[in-house]
Amino acid sequence: MPEPTAPDAATRGALHHVELWVPDLRRATRSWGWLLTELGYTPFQEWEDGRSWRLGATYVVVEQSPGLTSAAHDRTRPGLNHLAFSAGTRADVDRLAEACTEHGWALLFTDRHPYAGGPDHYAAYVEDVDGFEAELVATDP
């Protein structure tokens, strides 16, 4: 088997994109757009039913597809539970957790925050109005 070329080796297996089908594009653009921008993503694509934001080679899409079969996402059912993002320092996680409520997010697991993922895992778990969860993970010790 031939050795992969440098570009393939650098990107093979990397996440290319994530597409979230949402019941309300305007609401999702407000919440996800704010969060992704805060995490360093930049607007990438825009069309009638969707938007995307890109960081490096990876992008996140929110789309209000006419093919939706339900108006609600339930992260506790089979399928996607949450997206986890490296969010910078603990101070960055704290700042995002505090600001999230102004942008369509609610802090989850408040009784265990910021250690809901365990004593060695500093993170904020947030959920938008449509039930999508994001985990904001501190990358400093």
Task: List where the protein language model places each region.
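N-terminal beta-strand motif that seeds the catalytic metal site of vicinal oxygen chelate
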Residues: 1-29, 83, 140
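Vicinal oxygen chelate
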Residues: 2-11, 15-23, 73-99, 101-141
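Long, continuous compositionally biased terminal/linker segments
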Residues: 4-9, 55-88, 92-95
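Core segments of cupin and vicinal oxygen chelate
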Residues: 12, 19-64
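Alpha-helical elements of the RecA-like P-loop NTPase motor core of helicases
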Residues: 29-30, 94, 134
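Short amphipathic alpha-helices in soluble, non-transmembrane regions
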Residues: 31-34, 96-101
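A generic structural signal for ordered secondary structure
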Residues: 52-55, 84, 90, 100-103, ...
